[in-house]
Amino acid sequence: MRLHEIYPFQEERKNRKRVGRGGGSGWGGTSGKGHKGQNARSGGGVPAWFEGGQMPLARRLPKRGFKNPFREEYVALNVGQILGAFEGRTEISLEDIYERGLCKKGALVKVLGMGEVSAAVTIEAHRFSASATEKITKAGGTAKALEG
């Protein structure tokens, strides 16, 4: 037995449709493209968004809103996630968070308050939610907010 003899058998494989090979095949002559017109030409046809000349949907609907170029997006990390990744540590810097792969390097980090803080710990991040700050300080630690 050779590789080319293994399943699927030749009879089970569907032959591709060969067009333009005589009228007896059922796909001769115009090869299923009809007579003349844009769709009969090579490379012919209209793009998927073309609506036949009527005013396109994107132009019928009004413009709305804008994109703020100065928007800052923060990666949200819960206190529980951070402490779970750094068990036994008392100081967790932003660089540590990046190195551990909790978020991409250079991302703005906001710490949220879901999870338990049992020991005093110092955490560095760009922002802290009120609940996160409360939990960290209640356990005797500090929430160090960075600039930028």
Swiss-Prot record:
GO cellular component: cytosolic large ribosomal subunit
Job of this protein: Binds to the 23S rRNA.
HAMAP family: Ribosomal_uL15
Sequence similarity: Belongs to the universal ribosomal protein uL15 family.
PANTHER family named in the record: 50S RIBOSOMAL PROTEIN L15, LARGE RIBOSOMAL SUBUNIT PROTEIN UL15M
Compositionally biased spans, kind Gly residues: 21-32
Region (Disordered) location: 12-52
Domain of life: Bacteria
Keywords: Ribonucleoprotein, Ribosomal protein, RNA-binding, rRNA-binding
Subunit text: Part of the 50S ribosomal subunit.
Record flagged with keyword 4Fe-4S: no
Alphabetical list of Pfam families matching this protein: Ribosomal_L27A (PF00828)
Protein name, as recorded: Large ribosomal subunit protein uL15
A single BP term in Gene Ontology: translation
MF GO annotations: rRNA binding; structural constituent of ribosome
Species this protein is from: Maridesulfovibrio salexigens (strain ATCC 14822 / DSM 2638 / NCIMB 8403 / VKM B-1763)
Coiled coil: none
Disulfide-linked positions: none
